[in-house]
Amino acid sequence: DRSVSRGLGDVYKRQIMKNPIFTGAAVAIITPMNEDGTVNYDEFAKFIDFQIENGTDAIVVCGTTGESSTLKVVEHNECIRWCVEYVNHRVPVIAGTGSNSTACAIEISREACKNGADALLLVTPYYNKTSQRGLIAHYTAIHDATDLPIILYNVPSRTGVNIKPETAAELAKLPRVNGIKEASGDLDQVAKIHELCGDELNIWSGNDDQIYDILERGGKGVISVLSNIAPKETHDIVAKYLDGDKPASKELMDKYEKLAKAMFVDVNPIPVKEAVSLIGFNAGPLRLPLVEMDEANKKLSLIHISEPTRH
């Protein structure tokens, strides 16, 4: 019966689409800049190689840490295109394509699809503070206009809107909504999302100091700022947990928790770009309106960088 075969095929395709894009640690990678403010692709290439050689499981390009909000659309698209080409299938490339304009998010997402990204990371619409119904309509429109797996990004401290567990469960019904980067800081909410969605929605921590806690609540890993300076260690926190060695995972988490928190003594990505420069890469300047940390915050954030993280 062809209709039965077709039905089984659809189920199989859905299962494939719901498989996690990655397990482990994806780096929310910085965007190295030249002194004139243009993207420094030579340094970017070196930094990507460093990440992959040290166990990073995926690259998230043009996210918050990559200063996406200060990139022009043409730069944003080119950065994703270049990154996909340079990584060349060594690890998945997840493109940050979110916007508070649904039409703009669709435009950038379609370009990322065309340029070969493996998945899309879509932050909730910021500033305009839409409702839960608005979130469902926003993500559904992007889903229907594109053909890549989608990772929802919930970071209410930056956007002013929270994806409630029930909303996440509704969005998980869409075939290509693959997961959620959960940075609400609310562990009860994470547990509720997992309870409602199960394997229909993969969960990744969006907070480096909560990697272990979110793994305990069904998480598959982390989309990480810390990985910029400690890729192997961040990967190992997740890998050891998923391999069944929870004590070793917890020990590593405890060891790197202070460093993870130090990356947020000022607004991300200000501290981490400073830290990347300290481990031997030319991260370059920030784009306005972001400015360098004052000396007190520099000392506070960088005092925790230990020898194992040095390049």
Question: What do these predicted regions represent?
Answer:
Residues G7, G55, G116, T146-P149, ...:
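Conserved functional loop/turn residues at catalytic and ligand-binding sites
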Residues D144, R158-A260:
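Catalytic alpha/beta core domains of metabolic enzymes, predominantly
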Residues D1-Q15, I303-H311:
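Single conserved hydrophobic/aromatic residue that forms the stacking wall/gate
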Residues T97-G98, T124, N128, Y153-G160, ...:
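Glycine- and other small-residue-rich loops at beta-strand/loop junctions that grip anionic moieties
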Residues F44, H76, I80, A105, ...:
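A general structural signal for well-ordered alpha-helical segments in protein cores
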Residues S3-S5, T64, S68, S99, ...:
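Short linear Ser/Thr-Pro motifs
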Residues I21-P32, F50, N54-T56, E216-G219, ...:
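C-terminal alpha-helical cap/extension of soluble enzyme domains
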Residues N19-V27, E35-G160:
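Active-site beta->alpha loop and helix N-cap motifs at the rims of alpha/beta catalytic domains
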